[in-house]
Amino acid sequence: MTTKKQPDSTIALNRKAGFDYFIEDQYEAGLVLEGWEVKSLRAGKINLSDSHVIIKYGEAFLLGAQIQPLPTASTHFIPDPIRTRKLLMNKKELNHLIGSVERQGYTIVPLSLYWKKNKIKIKIALAKGKKEHDKRDTIKDREWQRDRSRIMKKNT
């Protein structure tokens, strides 16, 4: 008996977050979305690169994520591609995030958006910003890994 392969459930990745921040803890959260946004996410029309999470009034909100509406979206209202979206999380997780952001100088960045049991989830991370020299070190390490793999490939 063969099992069905699950298709890749990842909708979008924020590759810029790994370059700009030191990632500490990761959390999973649900998103409050409208119907047209879900349709656009199925089509993959989202950009997470300039987005971040803020905590206001004890709730988490996603800011700056651009979900482009499909051309077939309803004409009865004007969809806002950069609207603020509420994140659904446990109170315990929210309290931990609030403490880290306010006291220790962390920021919260989205890492990826994916499907989980027909629901859209977002992976967010508690992160500290990198300085310019840290980013240069990251670039040097990445280039060294590439060169090392080329050298190993030639020698084999």
Curated annotation (Swiss-Prot):
Region named Disordered: 135-156
Cellular component, GO, one term: cytosol
Coiled-coil stretches noted in the UniProt entry, renumbered to this chain: none
InterPro entries assigned to the protein according to its UniProt record, in alphabetical order: SmpB, SsrA-bd_prot, SsrA-bd_prot_CS
Biased composition (Basic and acidic residues): 135-150
Subcellular location: Cytoplasm
Main location: cytoplasm
GO biological process: trans-translation
Keywords assigned by UniProt, alphabetized: Cytoplasm, RNA-binding
NCBIfam families referenced in this protein's UniProt entry, alphabetically: PRK05422.1, smpB
Family from the record: Belongs to the SmpB family.
Role description: Required for rescue of stalled ribosomes mediated by trans-translation. Binds to transfer-messenger RNA (tmRNA), required for stable association of tmRNA with ribosomes. tmRNA and SmpB together mimic tRNA shape, replacing the anticodon stem-loop with SmpB. tmRNA is encoded by the ssrA gene; the 2 termini fold to resemble tRNA(Ala) and it encodes a 'tag peptide', a short internal open reading frame. During trans-translation Ala-aminoacylated tmRNA acts like a tRNA, entering the A-site of stalled ribosomes, displacing the stalled mRNA.
Name under which the protein is recorded: SsrA-binding protein
Native organism: Legionella pneumophila subsp. pneumophila (strain Philadelphia 1 / ATCC 33152 / DSM 7513)
Gene name for this UniProt entry: smpB
